Amino acid sequence: ISMAVFTAAAENKVPKVINCSSMARYGEQDITPFTEDLLPKPQDPYGIAKLASEQTLEVMSNVHGFDFVNLVPHNIIGPRQKYDDPYRNVVSIMINRILNGNPPIVYGDGSQERCFSDIEDVVNPIIESIHNEKAVGETINIGPDEDVISIKDLSYKILKILSSDLEPIFVDPRPQEVKIAHCSADKSRKLLGYDTTVNLDASITKIANWIIEVGPKKFRYHLDIEILNEKTPKTWKDRMF
């Protein structure tokens, strides 16, 4: 998809391409929060593909003469996010499970650390990057570096916000999951005027209220897992969601 977009941009003489990469580009690092100058070490095909899209865009920019910005949003959450997908969007998954009367599922001991970006705080920096000449050719993290939270604590926070007396279920870790992953917002503050205006509690509350309004759903498995082995999480094999 990325290659098709970049090719269309070149063919149609688009002056600037804004590429949304992913924090998955960083992989496992010795330093947190992740800064844009760290050597990427993606741990999964998604992260590898995102990094490849950045590199492809830079090459095409050099050849075809358009400007580009690589934005690196991380863990975007908000109302209208798909919440019946059992594989991604941990906040929405937990809320949907709890509203269906089921406890949240936590992989491993839940000590994995993340930051979550409310969609309202992500939109403005993206728009700003379109017009900001200082951002041209740059890779810029988009999202907060406040409210760092473990997945275990996240599950209890969501339970508290929903006034639920359920307890999390802890299952085996997922393979290739990065343990500590959160990004510095210093560069986006400097170049794009990034500012966190919606904290994690408020963001979770917005999502929960929206899911309550439209109604919780059963999780949908659209495709079977291509290759099963001993490392495939039991939650995926047995469709525990």
Enumerate the language-model features and the residues they cover:
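Active-site helix of classical SDR
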Residues: 45, 49-52
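Glycine/proline-rich active-site loop of Rossmann-fold NAD(P)-dependent oxidoreductases
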Residues: 51, 64, 76-92, 102, ...
